[in-house]
Design a protein with these regions (language model features):
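Accessory terminal helices/loops
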Residues: 2-4, 103, 117-131, 209-218, ...
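Conserved beta-strand hairpin/beta-sheet module of binuclear metal-dependent hydrolase folds
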Residues: 6-54, 173-187
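Short loop/helix-cap segments at secondary-structure boundaries that form the rim of catalytic
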Residues: 6-7, 78-84, 154-155
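Metallo-beta-lactamase
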Residues: 7, 37-38, 44-46, 98-235
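Hydrophobic/aromatic beta-strand patches that form the interior of the parallel beta-sheet core
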Residues: 13-15, 68, 88, 144, ...
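Acidic/histidine-rich helix-loop elements
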Residues: 16-21, 99, 104-106, 191-200
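Active-site metal-binding motif and surrounding structural segment of the metallo-beta-lactamase
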Residues: 36, 47-93, 212-218
Length: 247
C-alpha cells in the first residue's frame, strides 16, 4: 500500500495506485505550485483521501484548491468529500454524479444492488470494502464543469483539461501539464467496465494514438505506473499484434 508521494516531474507528484486487485485504489495525481495544490482524481473512499492528505502534509503542500475528476467511476470520485475543495469535471460527469449522489448508499443498498445486477458484484464488493462506513458518506458533485476544454492556471503550471470520452467512460477527460511534459490520461483508453465488456473488447488503440505527442514525456493512467511516451505507444502496438495473432 502506497503511503508517500512519488515525484514524476518538477511540481508534479503521484500518490500511486495500490496493485492489490480487490482494493481498486487508483492513482491520484498531485500538482503543487504557487502555494496551491490541485489533485487529479479524488481516490476511492474518504479513507483513501485521508491517506493522500497525510502524504500532502509530508511534503508541506497546502490542502487542495481543486480536485479534477477524470471521469465518474466510483473509484476515482468517492474520496471527494474529504478534501473540502470544489471538483472540476466534464458536464456529463456532473449529471452522472448527481444521480449517484441521490442513491441511499449503505451496506443494505449494496446488497440490493448485487441482487438486482449480479454482473456487478465484484465492483460492488470492492466499493463496500473501500468505503466501510456509509453513515456520513456523500458524493461530492462537481461545481465547475467543461463541455470540451478548459484551463486552470497555477504559478508556472498550466492544466489543460480536455474531454476525450471513450469506451471506458463517455465523460473521460485528460489533463495535460505542458510545462512539466506530463499528461494524465486516466482510464480513457481502457475497455468498457467489466460488467459491460465483450470478449472482443480491448485497449482503445485509436485513443492511444490520438494522445501521443512529442511535447509529453510521461503518461500516467488511472491504475498503472507512469510510462514514457514510447511505452505508452507500445500499448497500442502490442494490442494490434495480439489482434493479428488471434485471426
Amino acid at each position: 500500500m502506497a503511503e508517500a508521494l512519488v515525484q514524476v516531474a518538477p511540481q508534479v507528484y503521484l500518490y500511486p495506485a495500490d496493485d492489490t486487485p480487490d482494493r481498486v485504489q487508483p492513482n491520484v495525481g498531485v500538482l503543487v505550485a504557487g502555494g496551491k495544490t490541485v489533485l487529479i482524481d479524488a481516490g476511492n473512499s474518504p479513507r483513501h483521501a485521508r491517506r493522500v492528505a497525510l502524504a500532502l502534509d509530508a511534503i508541506q503542500a497546502n490542502p487542495p484548491t481543486y480536485v479534477i475528476y477524470t471521469h465518474s467511476h466510483w473509484d476515482h470520485v468517492f474520496g471527494g468529500q474529504a478534501y473540502g475543495a470544489p471538483a472540476i469535471a466534464h458536464e456529463q460527469c456532473r449529471r452522472t454524479l448527481m444521480e449517484m449522489a441521490s442513491r441511499p448508499w449503505s451496506n443494505l443498498y449494496i446488497q440490493e444492488e448485487i441482487q438486482r445486477n449480479p454482473a456487478r458484484e465484484s465492483t460492488l464488493r470492492a466499493m463496500q470494502k473501500a468505503v466501510e462506513e456509509w453513515r456520513h458518506f456523500r458524493i461530492l458533485v462537481p461545481e465547475i464543469t467543461l463541455s470540451k476544454r478548459m484551463h486552470v492556471f497555477l504559478d508556472g503550471l498550466t492544466l489543460d483539461i480536455e474531454h476525450v470520452g471513450g469506451a471506458h467512460a463517455a465523460d473521460s477527460v485528460v489533463v495535460r501539464v505542458p510545462e512539466a511534459r506530463v499528461i494524465f490520461v486516466s482510464d480513457c483508453y481502457y475497455p468498457p467496465p467489466m460488467h459491460l465488456r465483450k470478449p472482443e473488447d480491448g485497449l482503445d488503440k485509436a485513443m492511444i494514438d490520438s494522445l501521443l505527442d512529442d511535447a509529453y514525456d510521461v503518461y500516467i493512467d488511472g491504475h498503472g505506473k507512469p510510462r514514457t511516451r514510447d511505452e505508452f505507444a507500445a500499448l497500442a502496438e502490442n494490442e494490434r499484434m495480439q489482434m493479428n495473432g488471434s485471426r
